[in-house]
Swiss-Prot record:
It is found in: Secreted. The lineage of its organism: Eukaryota, Metazoa, Chordata, Craniata, Vertebrata. InterPro entries: Cbl-bd_prot, Cobalamin_Transport. Gene3D superfamilies: 1.50.10.20, 2.170.130.30. PROSITE patterns: COBALAMIN_BINDING. Glycans are attached at N94. One of its GO terms (biological process) is cobalamin transport. GO terms for cellular component: extracellular space. It comes from Bos taurus. Interacts with CD320 (via LDL-receptor class A domains). One of its GO terms (molecular function) is cobalamin binding. Keywords: Cobalt, Cobalt transport, Disulfide bond, Glycoprotein, Ion transport, Metal-binding, Secreted, Signal, Transport. This is Transcobalamin-2. Cob(II)alamin binds at residues 104, 152-156, 193-197, 245, 248, 294, 400-402.
Length: 432
């Protein structure tokens, strides 16, 4: 019996495998170490670095950060209300860029609900109206004939519906209908790990709508869409046990754990995913705060859908900062990484020498400092992402894809990925 088979046997016990999705009895030490990685991020309180997902993840986990949690929520409220509710200024051309995205607003609403707050009052109503307007604008971009696309993504569209749903705020049937149609008729929604994230978020939005019955006329379509979403995510499971890849697995499990459609296939798939996640925790795979915040609820058998009725009195273990071991002085080792740019003319190819352990972002900065390479990034909750390379800005429905040879898209962001010696990194402008 292989290692994975043996672990599945231990996890499943001597009886038959369950037909529901449960992620229980995960090593508490591994979970604590995961939570400890979020603590330094809770000291970063600038508008650019505040991340509502961190607060949501902790509140739905078995861990707590004590007084730091309350201070973090207070900082979120100040930042989001001031930036989103202030009047638009003609004097500041970057005013719109400084405001949180609608996806971030949706996460902020989830954070409020994670503290057992219902959004309300004049300020709260204005935020709800902003999110509803965003959904209406996206609905118009998709079009009456469904031939268009959201200006942002179906992920943010789904997240917006979910955030309003947990606050018992109804959106129009036509808004829900656009997401239903996408799941029913757009197979490209599930082609890679990003699409697993999108499908899982859409499924959680549908789950909330099903449980809350906010759109009763759409109930039958919602039920069928949830069945379709579950089937597609289960089919996306890799031989290693991940849904899409390791980083898309937490959101997929959040959806599957709340499934009202039990089956042996579901139970087996979740046991396999749990075994894979256990291995990833032991290898310290999760370092990005957004990914950690999506995983922590899973390890406590919770999901964003539980924010319909959160349990704010549940006991949670207090996190203590990890003890840091002073780094030993070492002679730095250098590695060589080949950097290529394709999809534009002229192309670019250059070898960069950097200290071992450098992030891809560090490598790009080094190439910029010592040659003609130029790049720009934009901050996001998952870290910086490329917006411009060699002066070429990604246009509408374009993005700069990052790959490593042989033609493998990176699963991590440029701030998290650390290339190895001799590796080739390609930046490719692609459409979507």
């Amino acid at each position: 019996m292989g290692h994975l088979g043996a672990l599945l046997f231990l996890l499943g016990g001597l009886g038959a495998l369950a037909n529901i999705c449960e992620i229980t009895e995960v090593d508490s030490t591994l979970v604590e170490r995961l939570g400890q990685r979020l603590l330094p991020w809770m000291d970063r309180l600038s508008q650019e670095q505040l991340n509502p997902s961190i607060y949501v993840g902790l509140r739905l986990s078995s861990l707590q950060a004590g007084a730091k949690e309350a201070h973090y929520l207070h900082s979120l409220k100040l930042s989001y209300q001031q930036s989103l509710l202030r009047p638009a200024s003609n004097k500041d051309d970057n005013d719109s860029e400084a405001k949180p995205s609608m996806g971030q607003l949706a996460l902020y609403l989830l954070a409020l609900r994670a503290n057992c707050e219902f959004i309300g009052g004049r300020k709260g109503d204005r935020l709800v109206s902003q999110l509803k307007r965003f959904l209406e604008d996206e609905k118009r971009a998709i079009g009456h004939n469904h031939q268009g696309h959201p200006r942002t993504s179906y992920y943010q569209y789904s997240l917006g519906i979910l955030a309003l749903c947990v606050h018992q705020k109804r959106v129009h049937d036509s808004v829900v209908g656009k997401l239903l149609y996408a799941v029913e008729h757009k197979p490209h929604l599930l082609q890679d790990h990003v699409s697993v994230d999108t499908m899982a978020m859409a499924g959680m939005a549908f789950s909330c709508l099903e449980l809350s019955n906010l759109n009763p006329k759409q109930r039958n379509r919602i039920n069928l869409a949830l069945k379709r979403v579950q089937e597609k995510i289960l089919k996306a499971q890799t031989p290693e046990g991940y849904f899409g890849n390791v980083y898309s697995t937490p959101l997929a499990l959040q959806l599957l754990m709340g499934s009202l459609r039990p089956s042996v296939e579901l139970g087996t798939a979740c046991l396999k995913a749990k075994a894979a996640l256990q291995a990833s925790l032991q290898h310290k795979t999760f370092q990005n705060p957004l990914m950690i915040s999506q995983l922590l609820p899973v390890l406590n058998q919770k999901s964003y859908v539980d924010l319909i009725s959160p349990d704010c009195q549940a006991p949670r273990a207090l996190l203590e900062p990890a003890l840091e071991t002073p780094p030993q002085a070492k002679v730095p080792k250098f590695i060589d990484v080949l950097l290529k740019v394709s999809g534009i003319s002229p192309s670019y190819r250059h070898s960069v020498s950097v200290p071992a352990g450098s992030s891809l972002e560090d490598i790009l900065k080094n190439a910029q400092e010592h040659g003609r390479f130029r790049f720009r990034t934009q901050a996001s909750l998952s870290g910086p992402f490329l917006t411009s390379v060699l002066g070429r800005k990604a246009g509408e429905r374009e993005f700069w894809q990052v790959l490593r040879d042989p033609d493998t898209p990176l699963q991590q962001g440029i701030a998290d990925y650390r290339p190895k010696d001799g590796e080739t990194i390609e930046l490719r402008l692609v459409g979507w």
